């Protein structure tokens, strides 16, 4: 399946289609959007975002704890869309505050 991903960035929102077997960060870059990242392995908080709507599968990541995931945080480098999803990007400072 392919879903519509909307990223709400500091520069404004962007939208693109993302297959359910491709990481949101990877697809965003293919579409020409620059997003923050570091490890690309789900082991840090550089790419953190917050889900405003929809759902993702980020089971490949290991940095976020259950409470952070419950609060809506997402690591875009290991997140597969499970529905149409809206994610607020650039949330590392909020996550680590």
Curated annotation (Swiss-Prot):
| Disulfide bridges in this chain | none
Q: How is the cofactor bound?
A: Binds 1 [2Fe-2S] cluster.
User: Is Metal-binding one of the keywords?
Assistant: yes
List each copy of the 2Fe-2S ferredoxin-type domain by range.
Answer: 3-93
Gene Ontology cellular component list: chloroplast; chloroplast stroma
Instruction: Tell me which positions the record assigns to the signal sequence.
Output: none
Q: Which cofactor does it need?
A: [2Fe-2S] cluster
Q: What is its main location?
A: plastid
Give the PROSITE patterns listed for this entry: 2FE2S_FER_1, 2FE2S_FER_2
Q: Kindly give the Gene3D superfamilies that the UniProt entry links to this protein.
A: 3.10.20.30
Q: Where does this one sit in the cell?
A: Plastid, Chloroplast
Q: Name one GO molecular function term.
A: 2 iron, 2 sulfur cluster binding
Q: Explain the purpose of this protein.
A: Ferredoxins are iron-sulfur proteins that transfer electrons in a wide variety of metabolic reactions.
Q: Which PANTHER family match?
A: FERREDOXIN, FERREDOXIN-2, CHLOROPLASTIC
Q: What is this protein called?
A: Ferredoxin
Query: Which species is this UniProt entry from?
Result: Solanum abutiloides
């Amino acid at each position: 399946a392919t879903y519509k991903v909307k990223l709400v960035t500091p520069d404004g929102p962007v939208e693109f289609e993302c297959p359910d077997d491709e990481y949101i960060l990877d697809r965003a870059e293919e579409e020409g959007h620059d997003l923050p990242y570091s490890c690309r392995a789900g082991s840090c908080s550089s790419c953190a975002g917050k889900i405003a709507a929809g759902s993702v599968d980020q089971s490949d990541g290991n940095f976020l704890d259950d409470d952070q995931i419950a609060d809506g945080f997402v690591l875009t480098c290991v997140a597969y869309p499970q529905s149409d999803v809206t994610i607020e990007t650039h949330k590392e400072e909020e996550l680590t505050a």
